[in-house]
Amino acid sequence: MYVKGRCSNMWRQISERLEDYPGRQKVARALVELGLSVREGTKIYCGGIELSDVKIARHLAVDRRTVRDTAQLISADPVLKSVFERIRPAGPFLADAAKFLGYSVIEIYADSHTVGIVAQAAALIAQENIAIRQAVADDPDLTPEPKLTLVVEKEPSGTILQKMLKIPGVKKISTY
C-alpha cells in the first residue's frame, strides 16, 4: 500500500505506527505472517474463522491484553484498518508435504531487490516441460533470509539448476 508522503513498504508503515509498543509489533507481525485479519472492530480472523485472543497470546508468549490492544489500535488507525481488514491467508504451503505428493521443491535464495528472478526461474522450469504447482516468495521485510520456494511436478535436471544459479541476483539454490 502506498500512502503519499510515506514509505511504500507495508511493514514499515505498520512498524512506524507501533514503534513504541514492541509487544504490539510482535502481534502485528504475526498477523501479517499468518494472513490473519482484524475485522468487525477488534475480532481477529483466519479466513472466516474467528480466533481467540488468549490462544494467539499463548502462541506469541504475550499477554492477551496485548493482542486485544493491538487489534484496537489497528481498528482505530485508518491506514492500518484498511490493510488488516483485507489480509487473507495465502492457502496451504505444499513444500513440507511435496515428497508425499510426488513433487519436488526448489528453494532460491537471492537478492530481494533484483527484478525478474521469478520470471527467469519459471521460464527455465518451463523449458523442461515441468509444471509449477506452487510459488511462494518470502517477504524480505519479515524474513531474515528470504527465499522463493517453487513446488514443481518433477525433479528438475542439474542443467536447469546450474542455469538458475546464473540468474542475476541468485545467491544459492537448494532442492529436495
Task: Show the residue positions of the predicted features.
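Gly/Ser-centered flexible loop/linker motifs
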Residues: C46-G47
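Short alpha-helical "recognition helix" segments of helix-turn-helix
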Residues: I56-A57
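Helix-turn-helix DNA-binding elements, focusing on the entry/boundary residues of the two helices
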Residues: D53
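A conserved regulatory-domain signal marking ACT and ACT-like small-molecule sensing domains
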Residues: Y2-G5, W11-E33, V38-K43, L73-Y176
